[in-house]
């Protein structure tokens, strides 16, 4: 097993970004990294999400809803079925809804949604609210 990523106690929450749009994935990773509160990793090919998730051990996964090869719902189902990743919160990102609809609390299969293009403040807020360590705070 690849032990490149190891989650240590008191470590910053890890966010896995699965999006075939490399520009969005890079921008989201940069935003999260520069916030100083998170460590982010990107996956451009959704078929590598499970493998990367197992090694990166994320605390939260942002998944694009519409991707070639596998859509976000398929990726989410794989992550949820995996013993090591079951229970990790998943947030969908998509162009299929407006920011207003996302803020109104719309969900897909019980998962929160962020509208693309995402405002920086909306993305940071939903990440913080979705993390188990921060949701009750």
Feature map (PLM): residue ranges:
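The feature encodes the CheY-like receiver
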Residues: 68-69, 98
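Alpha4 helix (beta4-alpha4-beta5 surface) of REC/receiver domains from two-component response regulators
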Residues: 74, 97-115, 121, 125
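Two-component/phosphorelay signaling modules centered on CheY-like receiver
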Residues: 22-41
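Active-site residues of response regulator receiver
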Residues: 64, 94
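Non-catalytic signal-transmission and effector/linker regions of two-component phosphorelay proteins
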Residues: 1-16, 119-137
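His-Asp phosphorelay/catalytic-motif detector in bacterial-type signaling
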Residues: 57-59, 84-89
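Acidic, metal-coordinating helix/loop segments flanking the phosphotransfer/catalytic sites
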Residues: 42-60
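Acidic catalytic/metal-coordinating carboxylates
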Residues: 44-48, 71-77
